[in-house]
Amino acid sequence: MDIIGGQHLRQMWDDLADVYGHKTALICESSGGVVNRYSYLELNQEINRTANLFYTLGIRKGDKVALHLDNCPEFIFCWFGLAKIGAIMVPINARLLREESAWILQNSQACLLVTSAQFYPMYQQIQQEDATQLRHICLTDVALPADDGVSSFTQLKNQQPATLCYAPPLSTDDTAEILFTSGTTSRPKGVVITHYNLRFAGYYSAWQCALRDDDVYLTVMPAFHIDCQCTAAMAAFSAGATFVLVEKYSARAFWGQVQKYRATITECIPMMIRTLMVQPPSANDRQHRLREVMFYLNLSEQEKDAFCERFGVRLLTSYGMTETIVGIIGDRPSDKRRWPSIGRAGFCYEAEIRDDHNRPLPAGEIGEICIKGVPGKTIFKEYFLNPKATAKVLEADGWLHTGDTGYCDEEGFFYFVDRRCNMIKRGGENVSCVELENIIATHPKIQDIVVVGIKDSIRDEAIKAFVVLNEGETLSEEEFFRFCEQNMAKFKVPSYLEIRKDLPRNCSGKIIRKNLK
């Protein structure tokens, strides 16, 4: 079944411009408060100009172009401008440093880079010291260094016509993007995403939160991340809604932005919810138009209830990963919600729990969450130039091994337990990091928490807790361990405590555990 009607991204944008014309498509707010607005017609013209810019710089179908940008209009222009000419976007996490950025450039084979002056010195060094295929850099800033091989993105774009100059034949099976995974435990892998993947993601995510063309979807998630692209942007555009892209998250500013833009849909991760809850209560906390808050793992029931009560919202759970493109398990429109369940499998997917021998498990038993989809259509196509890694997680019949543990109840509701790599083996017992973190997070003095396993000669692994305290608080080891002993089984109580000012996180809010080992 062809859900998207054979429509690639070039056709999508031409149709959106025709149908929605002067309706607002995109609003971007910078950290400095500068706001840019584009109608569907204007945005399609900017996308065409950007496509023509790339063509004049020698980019052709199949070429890879890297983007190292914070949330900004240029990211959207480049993403779809490249797609229109059959080129491939390689977004780079804007928080990565030289070594990691160079590694992605090398492994993606990108020949052109779009970035800002903030990151340019790093790429100067990469060009001098690393072997890459990079031959040109476009900077989005007005002021340019007097260097060869560097151009002004804005100046070149504005010189281009608003109609497309180069339109090679496209297929929905063509690669549109190579998105490198966050690599919190190992080197990132390049997830190959097709035009079909992105078009399907738009329809699916719009269905998931029942989007209409009068909706306003606001996100602070980074544009180089799958959530922003496929759960937010593609959903909003596919429905003809308005997409609001905020440059960076600020707990102090977020709720005001929700109110200012009259957002009806937004998305949150646990870090956002916890930082919003420590903001001073306001009489305007419930003055908003939000219908749904898309939510991604993991939060204790106490935290969830407190957030929903204070702000008068409900959470729409969604479970997925870069490889699944969208939240393939989640709450369904007009369906019952069963916290702490992560929901049921969405349309076009199958899900089941399997044991260590790849056999399905009955309801109630914990095993690996496995998802069945169609590679290159409803799930990722493959890992770029890495068939061994692809074969490790993706079976020939479309079953994807997520590496997450969970269980399912009799009604098909799934429950997340933990990442397999986040299970601590302690004296013959398996201990879930997420379970402990949810318990410890309820301590009134603790703002942020992560637990990890460290080598122990007697018990396989010992448990160490890293905590960030609320401002002005102090916490003794005696108080911490007493709290743990009162709220969890003895074998789950951490052996060590370290209080820190912050925890290392990637762009999507996930703890970078390898930095805490």
From Swiss-Prot:
PROSITE patterns recorded: AMP_BINDING
Keyword Translocase in record: no
UniProt GO BP: carnitine metabolic process; fatty acid metabolic process
InterPro entries in the record: AMP-bd_C, AMP-bd_C_sf, AMP-binding_CS, AMP-dep_synth/lig_dom, ANL_N_sf, CaiC
The UniProt record lists the keyword Cytoplasm: no
Keyword terms of this UniProt record: Ligase
Biochemical pathway: Amine and polyamine metabolism; carnitine metabolism
SUPFAM superfamilies: Acetyl-CoA synthetase-like
EC number: 6.2.1.48
Reactions mediated catalytically: 4-(trimethylamino)butanoate + ATP + CoA = 4-(trimethylamino)butanoyl-CoA + AMP + diphosphate; crotonobetaine + ATP + CoA = crotonobetainyl-CoA + AMP + diphosphate; (R)-carnitine + ATP + CoA = (R)-carnitinyl-CoA + AMP + diphosphate
Signal sequence annotation: none
Molecular function, one GO term: medium-chain fatty acid-CoA ligase activity
Annotated PANTHER family: ACYL-COA SYNTHETASE, MEDIUM-CHAIN ACYL-COA LIGASE ACSF2, MITOCHONDRIAL
Role according to the record: Catalyzes the transfer of CoA to carnitine, generating the initial carnitinyl-CoA needed for the CaiB reaction cycle. Also has activity toward crotonobetaine and gamma-butyrobetaine.
UniProt-listed HAMAP family: CaiC
Family: Belongs to the ATP-dependent AMP-binding enzyme family.
Protein name, entry field: Crotonobetaine/carnitine--CoA ligase
Organism field: Escherichia coli (strain 55989 / EAEC)
